[in-house]
Amino acid sequence: APKNDREINKNSRCSLNFPYLLLQVLYRKLGRKINGKINDFFKPNNLLSIFEEYLPFKGSKVNKEDIKDFMEMLVRARLALDICFIRPTEYGYSLDMNLNEDNESLKNLLMLQSMLYVSSSNYTNYRWFNWLMDEVERYGLPDVNLLYSSLKKKMDNESPLPEYKALTYSGDNRYWFWRLDFYIWQHRKELFHKDSPEMTIVENYVFKRNRSIEHIAPQTP
């Protein structure tokens, strides 16, 4: 999808809405160990019952220190999402990191994070969220190149390249189409002439959450 308007920072929003942010922070506080299925845990409709089970806020089982710890984690997470992770906008994504938006390293991180974001769901966002928070809790505001390398390494370890025969339209793994788009963007200067129409397309590419492989494939430059 082309960036038709450069006002990419206008009306940006957090990558996680508040109910999902609460659940992500709770999941991290619990050491990613829960009872039952993860799909049931990450359902906003179950928010109150989940907190009543894992972090009681009323009655005799209330632990004030646990609640205080959770609130501190919540503040850190929200700051991390505002500064160190992409924020969706009307035209694409913005990324702060206290750097100029023309910084090449920032662009690399933005594209990697946007690929991770669109290829995740409400039930798998915990992967990139915890990868991010590991770095933030270790370094505070991570170096942009260090954060990029860390996220990419964890992505590669989490999703190693499958065998060639598995990468076909007969499968239903949209992830690898997004990943291919990321690699094309990453190696664009090697693949396309700088003044070619193809380079213009790749330079302005924006990752989108598409619902079908048929929708994704034609977007690949």
Predicted feature residues:
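Flexible coil/loop and intrinsically disordered segments
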Residues: A1-P221
